[in-house]
A protein has these predicted regions:
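Conserved small/polar residues in nucleotide/adenosyl-binding loops
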Residues: 157-161
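Canonical P-loop GTPase G-domain recognition
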Residues: 140, 144-148
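Short E/K-rich amphipathic alpha-helical oligomerization segments
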Residues: 147-156
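N-terminal accessory targeting/assembly segments
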Residues: 1-115
């Protein structure tokens, strides 16, 4: 059964991670990671660590190879982070795999931005727009939530007549 790990109400320490593949992207990725630090700080969350991870190839499961994924897991344990925040856009399956690996909540940049908008929405219309954006973001992440019911047999109802 698939389990959605909810963000704790109060995340105190987050570890920031940015994965890049081309060495020429390192400077740009560092700048984006610094910007992500400011975004996360705006939510009142302390930064436990910032890590720029170089990966040779893009992999479907974790975005990086399993060796680099284990390295990120160890870094999260070492800095005692409550949450791992990725600068990269994670697919729903990648987010699930990371949550299983690090056993903490895992979010990406888009979710951080949605949280900031949600906190700053003042009007009813703004609140509804943010809620719609959150639902659109969450929908693919819930797609496999009820898989445990897929293999249950169909109950046929027959009338007594």
């Amino acid at each position: 059964m698939f389990e959605i790990r909810e963000k704790p109400e109060m995340v105190e320490r987050a570890m920031l991670v940015s994965i890049y593949f081309d060495p020429s992207e390192a400077g740009e990725k560092q700048a984006m990671l610094d910007e992500l630090e400011d975004l996360v700080s705006n939510l009142g969350i302390g930064i436990a660590g910032k890590h720029l991870i170089k990966s040779r190839d893009m992999h479907a499961k974790f975005l990086c190879g399993t060796g680099k994924a284990q390295e990120v897991k160890q870094l999260a344990l070492d800095c005692r982070a409550d949450c791992v925040v990725f600068d990269n856009m994670l697919s729903p399956s990648q987010q699930r795999e990371w949550e299983r690996l690090v056993d903490e909540c895992v979010i990406d940049r888009e979710e951080v931005i949605l949280d900031i908008f949600a906190r700053r929405a003042r009007t009813r219309e703004a609140t509804l727009q943010v809620e719609l954006a959150r639902m659109q973001y969450s929908l693919p992440r819930m797609a496999r939530m009820w898989n445990h019911l897929d293999r249950q047999g169909c109950l046929l109802y027959t009338s007594p007549s």
